């Protein structure tokens, strides 16, 4: 009947749909089971439920449509809440590997509403912990630049505005905007300081409580808080044109000095930055002194004597630019003590000039000392290099070296200085730890070393050892790097320049070697059976100035001592190269192997004889020691026996005689 009423043939899908009404009738029971079902069962995917609802016939869907919609909404809501909780509770495995155990939060528990709130709080705290600035990072340095700007603004313009009333009144709206913008930056800096990490046991601390305690208990925190006290509120009592009420903003100076220190460390031109920094300090002092001079002149009275600022009623001296430039000129002459200024008249003027002279002497001494030291540091490398040249010149003159050779040596030194190749890498890097030296050497030389055929597919540890042993060498035009028949003790890698393989006449060129090429690597391995042996097979000459890296045979053997497997790999690699080039005599290799076996047997026999001799000597020493020990034991036994007999006799003589019989 079902098939006829539907007008279609029965199918598995239709048969399945026939059972749907029964399922719908049991919705109430299903809902109760769903509420009592464990959490693990409730976590099943709802896709099957959606599919089951979609497969229902239209009439059946209309009969229980509202109930199914309600149930579907409930299931979707439950599924969304579950995924939301899982998203918050899921730990970041990548970050957890780098965060300390004290920062790892416990996974949120799924349960009632209170547990959800706790989980949300912990998740928020966990995310908040990630926003910790590393004081050695780039973002912290950029923030130092941001905070240094308002600090420098306050240090320069607050004093000027307090002294020059025209400057304060003429641009009041500009100062109002800049003042409160700097206040916002100050407040932001206070919070950033609370989120700035520090190192403890070599690890960056990210615990908010530790960060807060580390900052709050410092003097800098007190100064930072004092610098953001809203003293501007006093404007309502005394008027808005009193910028001296904001002098507490000057207490935030430490951040500017910290920015200067970090910039000096980061910059590639530290000497130039030190000079610029020193000039900035001097200009700020001169600026402050000019402002104070104008303020003193205002308090005494403009134009009352020759020392103070002229009367501002005079049009020549009555505008702001002339006021500041005149005071700045007077301050510069006074502090540098290089010009004549009007003499003081009143006592307070004398005291101020005396104070200025003392400050000027300190400034002059600081300039001379710092600039002289900086110039000496800047010229230290040049002076050391020039001393080497002078020593070589003196030696060549003493030994009466030819002018041509002397000119060649001077040109070689000139090439080194012009191309900045005078630095001794080992001397410069000797103060670094071995690991850092290795990393620098790897970054500089590893790609070059990998170009050598015998070092391809070599063990990484051995390559690191070899990289540390590469020595740069510079050859002049026409210099022979090696000659045919010379014993090969080094291998060379060309960094820059052109080398030519020439005939014995030194003119005919057979081949040209450029940057990245290498030669001499086979000869330093001393591979047995090589037709070349350890001798050079060609003349190699530098066409111009050439920069090469040199690796000596002794350094290679010292490095492979700790890597015996790598040594075998290198020798095998060298044999393969020689075989490809037809330079390996297999008969000689076999003969050398037989010779090696015989030598090993002879060495073994020698070692056995040596061991036998040593064993015989030790046995003789052991026998002699046993005899001496037995003799000493015998002597001790005799002495013990004699002592026992003597003690027995002495005891018998000292015992009392038997008492005589009593008389009747």
From Swiss-Prot:
Residues 167-176, 242-246, 297-319 are extracellular. It is a multi-pass membrane protein. GO terms for biological process: calcium ion transport; potassium ion transport; sensory perception of smell; sodium ion transport. GO terms for molecular function: calcium channel activity; calmodulin binding; cAMP binding; cGMP binding; intracellularly cAMP-activated cation channel activity; intracellularly cGMP-activated cation channel activity; protein-containing complex binding. Residues 460-580 are annotated as: Cyclic nucleotide-binding domain. The record marks 364, 368 as: Central gate. Residues 337-340 are annotated as: Selectivity filter. 3',5'-cyclic AMP binds at residues 536-537. Disulfide bonds: none annotated. The C-terminal coiled-coil domain mediates trimerization of CNGA subunits. This is Cyclic nucleotide-gated channel alpha-2. It comes from Oryctolagus cuniculus (Rabbit).
